């Protein structure tokens, strides 16, 4: 059994602060074959979480400590009129993103978490050292996740 307590949170913070990525996760699955993903993630200010999405799963994010902003993006239509002889294949990614929502996660204010809809592009901005509990459907590496 794993008990999530103050000592575990402190240990995650201690590891995150010395990690070059400024974050540290702890896998809470029973085995790599689990059909769901459950983890704690300690995030330090300055960490960069690339904009990404999970096309086949919602992502539940609960902030256990700290303060961060979950930022949601939506795809913006690319230019509809291309110069003569060009089409959408000539646009590098064929898509752009625009910010559509921001959710402050701060348990001290009673804002504990959010559910990011399947397919929504998102990232986090860490305002102070934070630990989140994340849950997604599907096996790790097989859930269709992609980075923008």
Locations of the language-model features?
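A short, N-terminal "cap"/entry segment at the start of jelly-roll beta-barrel domains
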Residues: 1-36, 50, 81-88, 96-103
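Double-stranded beta-helix
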Residues: 3, 12, 77-78, 89-104, ...
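Short, charged/polar surface micro-motifs in flexible loops or helix N-caps
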Residues: 33-36, 44-48, 65-69, 75-78, ...
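Short, surface-exposed charged micro-motifs
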Residues: 40, 60, 123
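Conserved short histidine dyad/triad with adjacent acidic residue
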Residues: 40-56
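Short beta-strand His + acidic residue motifs that chelate non-heme Fe in jelly-roll/DSBH
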Residues: 50-52, 70-71, 114-116, 122-127, ...
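Glycine- and acidic-residue-biased ligand/ion/polar-headgroup-sensing regions
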Residues: 56-78, 89-95
């Amino acid at each position: 059994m794993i008990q999530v307590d103050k000592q575990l949170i402190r240990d995650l913070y201690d590891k995150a602060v010395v990690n070059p990525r400024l974050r540290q996760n702890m896998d809470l699955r029973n085995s790599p074959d689990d059909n769901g993903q459950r983890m704690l993630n300690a995030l330090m200010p300055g960490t960069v979480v690339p904009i990404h999405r999970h096309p086949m799963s919602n992502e539940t994010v609960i902030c256990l400590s700290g303060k961060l902003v979950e930022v949601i993006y939506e795809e913006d239509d690319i230019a509809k009129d291309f110069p003569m002889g060009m089409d959408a294949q000539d646009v590098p990614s064929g898509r752009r993103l625009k910010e559509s929502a921001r959710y402050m996660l701060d348990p001290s204010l009673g804002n504990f978490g959010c559910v990011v809809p399947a397919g929504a592009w998102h990232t986090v901005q860490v305002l102070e050292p934070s630990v989140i509990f994340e849950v997604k459907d599907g096996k790790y590496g097989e859930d269709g996740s992609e980075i923008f």
